[in-house]
Swiss-Prot record:
UniProtKB keywords: Cytoplasm, Peroxisome, Protein transport, Thioester bond, Transport, Ubl conjugation
Taxonomic source organism: Saccharomyces cerevisiae (strain ATCC 204508 / S288c) (Baker's yeast)
Location of cross-link Glycyl cysteine thioester (Cys-Gly) (interchain with G-Cter in ubiquitin): C5
Function: Receptor that mediates peroxisomal import of proteins containing a C-terminal PTS2-type peroxisomal targeting signal via its interaction with PEX7. Interaction with PEX7 only takes place when PEX7 is associated with cargo proteins containing a PTS2 peroxisomal targeting signal. PEX7 along with PTS2-containing cargo proteins are then translocated through the PEX13-PEX14 docking complex together with PEX21. Acts as an activator of the seryl-tRNA synthetase SES1 by increasing its binding to tRNA.
Gene label: PEX21
Protein name: Peroxisomal protein PEX21
Gene Ontology molecular function: any one: protein carrier chaperone
Coiled coil: none
UniProt similarity note: Belongs to the peroxin-21 family.
Annotated phenotype, changing F236A: Decreased formation of a ternary complex composed of PEX21 and PEX7 along with PTS2-containing cargo proteins
Protein's cellular compartments: Cytoplasm, Cytosol; Peroxisome
Length: 288
């Protein structure tokens, strides 16, 4: 048989395997076989394997031997020189710089870092036992200097200081409420003058005259109770009682010499109707 028509079954198997690998839908990492080792291997073992395969067809061990011989040795694989190491991107990635316009400034980051460290220090002091503070004085010493913001934060963490602050705030709130409901006339004008004193004296006398004296007799007590019940419904007596107690006073005009209205000293509201002064004159034309 001429050498041109001679076809080795081993080469057919290898070519078919290469064709299947190239046409596969799932790509795999291809490795290079040492061409010199394969050529020498097939040149020396080709004739021997063919004879063994043809003459021992009934023996299946021959096929297994051929299959085992076709498996390449792990030593025959060589790694291409153009591959890149997987760890080469680490220094390049760490050296990258990103210019973010929304990033905080370095001064703000430094201040915030100091703030967080101070918070951790305060929390650790709160959980520290008292006896350890007495024995180890160095572990409980405070820093020599603090900023104003850190001092305020430390004062908030102290429950005693917080309680004192709440008490002072309540006192201040009561003073503000007292000034808010105080009438403006009391602060701006000298409302308790001679006219007001005279009006209060007259109102007190009226209330005393309309109040029956206490008596032990049953008939007089019944009469006094009926009079008191009638007077309690009188708006005039109620007004006199308010003037006598100082709850209602005169509201002076802008000149401060005359008064035409009454107002409540508790809430500043007007009491009753405005007094309209009428001159006491006699017209001669009417008499004529």
């Amino acid at each position: 048989m001429p050498s041109v028509c001679h076809t080795s079954p081993i080469e057919k198997i290898i070519q078919q395997g290469h064709r299947i690998q190239n046409d596969s839908l799932i790509p795999s990492k291809r490795t290079k076989l040492a061409h010199t080792e394969l050529t020498a291997h097939y040149a020396t073992e080709d004739s021997h394997v063919e004879k063994h395969f043809l003459h021992n067809g009934s023996n299946f061990d021959g096929i297994d031997n051929v299959r085992y011989q076709n498996q390449p040795s792990p030593l025959t694989f060589i790694t291409p020189n153009n591959t890149v190491d997987s760890s080469d991107w680490v220094p390049q990635f760490s050296s990258m710089k990103i210019d973010d316009s929304l990033e905080f400034s370095s001064e703000y980051k430094r201040l915030y870092s100091n703030y967080e460290s101070q918070q951790r220090l305060n929390s650790s002091r709160q959980h520290l036992p008292f006896k350890n503070c007495m024995i180890r004085k160095t572990s409980c010493t405070y820093p020599p200097q603090k900023t104003l913001r850190q001092q305020r934060q430390g004062n908030r963490d102290n429950p005693t200081d917080a309680f004192q602050f709440d008490a002072e705030f309540q006192v201040l709130e009561r003073e503000i409420q007292k000034e808010r409901y105080e009438p403006i006339t009391r602060r701006d004008e000298k409302w308790f003058d001679q006219d007001q004193s005279e009006l209060q004296r007259i109102a007190t006398d009226i209330v005393k005259c309309c109040t029956p004296p206490p008596s032990s007799a049953s008939s007089s007590s019944t009469l006094s109770s009926s009079v008191e019940s009638k007077l309690s419904e009188s708006k005039f007596i109620q007004l006199m009682r308010n003037i006598s107690s100082g709850d209602v006073t005169l509201k002076k005009n802008a000149d401060g010499n005359s008064a035409s209205e009454l107002f409540s000293s508790n809430n500043g509201e007007l009491v009753g109707n405005r007094h309209i002064f009428v001159k006491d004159e006699i017209h001669k034309d009417i008499l004529d």
